[in-house]
């Protein structure tokens, strides 16, 4: 059986160094799915209402830019809140180590005990961890407060989600922008491939097969577009 990844020292080091990128990958996938779903839903709704291609482009572009910015701003605010909380708790733990070192060592003992360390091994681990204050505090933030082990970068997260939203959100509009006919049929095909592709990529971080993840994402996008199209038909002249 082929293992999912290698275990040479270089491969292990590279994999550990990449942990901080998982959040950006999540943001890119989330932004890509939402960008495609919302834009194609607008295309389907306007098409269902029987309105012109110009209105499709105008409303679609407005959604891509405005909703993309809104998502990026919301992501920035949420990520910044986590980063600010991490910095606040870092200062708290640093002060506690300075003013009540034994109490913090007792906390570290309990954390290590919950991980199964006992006796001499536990004492050696405590000694080594507490010798590096930054690593000690980082461990406490993760184990005591449940914060991620790496510091969040709000601006980078916002840029990633905005770029993914815009890039994926423009795809359903592409046939209208370059004059492909019939534009709506092309938009359906392009959006369907985008939904499936993003879902297939997402499967790398799930336990389900790539084709199933692709189909699930395709069905979600298709359902949203169908609802929008049905609402649009209600207002068809």
PLM region descriptions:
Residues 2-27, 79-161:
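Cytosol/matrix-facing amphipathic helices and coiled-coil assembly/linker segments
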Residues 181-193:
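Structural signature of hydrophobic alpha-helical transmembrane segments
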Residues 197-222:
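Interfacial loop-to-transmembrane junctions
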Residues 38, 70-82, 134-138, 142, ...:
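Alpha-helical transmembrane segments and their lipid-water interface positions
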Residues 43-58, 173-183, 230-237:
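Helix-coil boundary and interhelical linker segments in multi-pass alpha-helical membrane proteins
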Residues 35-40, 161-172:
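Core segments of transmembrane alpha-helices
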Residues 66, 70, 168, 172, ...:
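Alpha-helical transmembrane segments of multipass membrane proteins
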Residues 2-78:
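Internal alpha-helical transmembrane segments
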